[in-house]
Amino acid sequence: MTSHALLTVEEAARRIREGRALILAGDEAALARLPAGTWIGGTTPYFMTAEGGLRSRDHVFASEVPAAAERVAIAVYAAADLPRVYAELPERGYGVLLMPLFSLAELAFAVGAPGYDGFATRPLVGWVSGTDVGDTGRRAPKVYDGRTGAALLQEAVVLQVSLPAAITAEIGIVNVFSAGGGDVLGFAEGGFSASEVLVDGRLRGLTGYLLETGLDVRRPLVGEYCGARLNVGVREVDWAAGVVHFWAPVFPGISYRHAAPVGEYVDEFLARAPAQVLAAGTEGLGFCCNCYSNYAHGELEGKRTGPFVGPVVFGEIAYQLCNETLVYLSVGGPRG
């Protein structure tokens, strides 16, 4: 039986009752019907499956914790408690963190994670839950503590997985975007929105700069954080107020460039993924998620993304909050 699958609610409930430890994604109506057990979940109706990308309110995507896991625990964190999240991960193993879009937990983690005690010393992956884009503003994103079935609006939930010494967990990011050759951009203040931008060191109004240059806001800004190339996608441009809202925060002191154009998304994903991960296939993955912006702009509905199956989400976690990336966790023996 595959460890990652799109299931009916009844199939997911059966696996929970069998005592399996699961990471679940689905519409609120589907997740609310599940029994208590060792699982965490988050809302999204979009998925990458072996048959291609799809939208479904009636199914649940399940990723099962590897059978080799020695211990699985669940913890809930309020925003003020998140600085402990790395210190409380198992010494050998990994964590999966889920939090609702625009929740207090997401805002705290997005800005504060790099300063947490033990940041990036242990593998932490996860995602930001959302809703069908047609329900934006009408339904709230949620995450679930499967021990009780409680739906959480402002907190984060973490699955803590302990592994034997012979098993390793390694985070990977597939980013189809690279920095273009345009202006170097910076921000004097950090956050999820900005009205001003530093253009090659000169302060300018951000919306005016976008109008003047005609930048395609479907492509993100690309910056380097802690040696990794990460994206900041534009969520909305409020032309009247002169403010740009982002899916992930910008940080002062980071240099950004507008992303270069991308060709066929699936081809780019597979070309940039490590060969050993592709060879290992889905069974070698302990976790995977892709960004909704990639799903929408890359027109991934009905398209297959190789071994990378999982939920389509509204922010990805690979140590810290990422955007417009595919994040995965490889679980297996030591590599030679």
Question: What do the predicted segments below correspond to?
Answer:
Residues 1-336:
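Hydrophobic alpha/beta core scaffold segments
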